[in-house]
Amino acid sequence: KYDKCVVVGHWPVCLYQKDINCMNAIFAVDKNVIAIDGGCALKIGAQLNALVIPQKNALMQECSVETYDDFPSLVASRNQEYQKATISIKYFDSEVKVLEEQDDIVFVQHVSSGVKFWEPQSYLYKNSNGVFSGDITDTWLEIHKGDIIKVIERTSKGMIVKKDGMLGWYQE
């Protein structure tokens, strides 16, 4: 824990959270740390997190965050129930095996966990060590008809979207 509030970047906030893929700033009050790196230019669904400090000697709890991304907005046309992720891939454990390909989407198996899931084909990359996935989750976000969501990518199996900084799937 730091004596004074420390603001950190460089390490995208989505990497601090194991089971979700969220780009929002993290206020770790118990450690006196605010992490603001939204993954710009590095992460799928990235956003700019700008820390707003209302006055010179403001307490950490008085600060807020404004976010920005340039993904297109969409008004949700239907309700969707939340389905918790069975996997949330991060770059440091992202090797996959392709099991099936369908147009713009692939069914893969995460090598270290054995979990099988669908993801956009465009999220895969290869190198001499194998086939790897970009950061992805199989979470289906809770979305209500009329919610404003951001469209990250459209696929034949649904859309990767962002709602309130959280990435996941939505079926229109």
Name the predicted role of every residue range:
Residues 1-172:
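Feature recognizes metal-dependent phosphohydrolase scaffolds
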